[in-house]
Amino acid sequence: MSPDTEEQTGLTIYLYPVIAWIILVTKIESGLRTRTFPVVHGDEGNNLIPLPEDVKNIRIVQSWPDTFLAKATVGAETIDMGIHVSPDVEALKKEAIELIKHKGSLRKAKKDAERESIVSGWFQSKFQSELLNLKKGWRIRGIVRAESPESKTLFNIELIKRVERRKDASHLRSGVFTPYQKSRIEDIPLSQRKIEPGEVDVPIPYDGIYRIAISPNVKTTYFVELFVEKGS
């Protein structure tokens, strides 16, 4: 066998895994399916879905036999529903619609009040916000939606430090208080409020420093969008 023939044979052996990988990837990609649901605006009584006029479509992308990516196009914005391990496409479609409706209400809220975003995204474990400097009369608004129906994801807002307008305020130092430090400050009450997941609308009772935490009771993926609505 000539050196040229041996070189070609060796090259062919090295190419076999590469060719096999290309064929496998091609087969996987050919198995991906994207289903686009055009949105029909109309009356719910006629089995049509009433949605804001700027909603264009809902797309369910199957990336594996039991894994789906759900997205929706609202105006120039794409709403990402995240990864779902569920073959129930209709359930995903319904969930996307609910989120779109909520996004529409949030867009309206932007026009009605001054607001500041706290968080927006998908989480798989406990979420804890940074310290928030909030004033009495403001509101925490938004949505907490868990993917698992068994999840009783709890929303918790804690008053870390109450700020009172008085002359003697030397003890109201800025910074993070440890649990030990907090226990020593007797005249600053702590308050907690827990609610079931869904629409969040919590009025702020005092000027102060707050922290928000969200904890699912089972392993699940959940969507959070929270903002501070500033009022008088």
From Swiss-Prot:
Sequence intervals crossing the membrane: 10-32
Membrane topology: Single-pass membrane protein
Record key words, sorted: Membrane, Transmembrane, Transmembrane helix
Major localisation: membrane
Location relative to the cell: Membrane
GO cellular component, one term: membrane
Protein name: Uncharacterized protein AF_2010
Record organism: Archaeoglobus fulgidus (strain ATCC 49558 / DSM 4304 / JCM 9628 / NBRC 100126 / VC-16)
